[in-house]
């Protein structure tokens, strides 16, 4: 049986790791062991942060909606409650886009939410010391 030499596979394995580590600083892009550790960590970070990105965007959308809703005399939670009672099914991403790029359309949605809310609960509560 022929003897199997592993130099080709070893060089390919090292080359792939060093190609993935291109752009890293210092030894992490030049030395195989350091590059392998950094590439492994980078893949872990990428996996984790692809999932974290969803929550970050949701928080950003909520902040934008809240700011625009308060400018129209309603708080975020009252706006969402009013839209739910009115039967408007618009997700937070679209609401945030409307708040930024289409303020008139967003204002009409706020008015729809205000009319759907029960009486005397549509005004936001203002802090006493503000």
UniProtKB/Swiss-Prot annotation:
Q: Which GO terms describe its biological process?
A: ribosomal large subunit assembly; translation
Per UniProt, the keywords (alphabetical) are: Ribonucleoprotein, Ribosomal protein, RNA-binding, rRNA-binding
Q: Name a GO CC annotation attached to this entry.
A: ribosome
Record-linked InterPro entries: Ribosomal_bL20 (IPR005813), RIBOSOMAL_L20_CS (IPR049946), Ribosomal_protein_bL20_C (IPR035566)
Which PROSITE patterns does this UniProt record tie to the protein? RIBOSOMAL_L20
- Which residue spans traverse the membrane? none
- One GO MF term: rRNA binding
Family, per the entry? Belongs to the bacterial ribosomal protein bL20 family.
Its biological purpose is as follows: Binds directly to 23S ribosomal RNA and is necessary for the in vitro assembly process of the 50S ribosomal subunit. It is not involved in the protein synthesizing functions of that subunit.
Q: Which HAMAP family match?
A: Ribosomal_bL20
In its UniProt entry, what is this protein called? Large ribosomal subunit protein bL20
């Amino acid at each position: 049986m022929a003897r199997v030499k592993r130099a080709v596979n070893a060089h390919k394995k090292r080359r792939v790791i060093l190609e993935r580590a291109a752009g890293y600083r210092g030894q992490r892009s030049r030395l195989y062991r350091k590059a392998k550790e950094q590439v492994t960590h980078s893949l872990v970070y990428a996996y984790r942060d692809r999932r974290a990105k969803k929550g970050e965007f949701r928080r950003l959308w909520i902040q934008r909606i809240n700011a625009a809703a308060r400018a129209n005399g309603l708080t975020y939670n009252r706006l969402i409650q009013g839209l739910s009672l009115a039967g408007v099914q618009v997700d937070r991403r679209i609401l945030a886009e409307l708040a930024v790029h289409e303020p008139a359309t967003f204002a009409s949605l706020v008015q729809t939410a205000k009319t759907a809310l029960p009486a005397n609960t549509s005004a936001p509560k203002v802090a006493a010391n503000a």
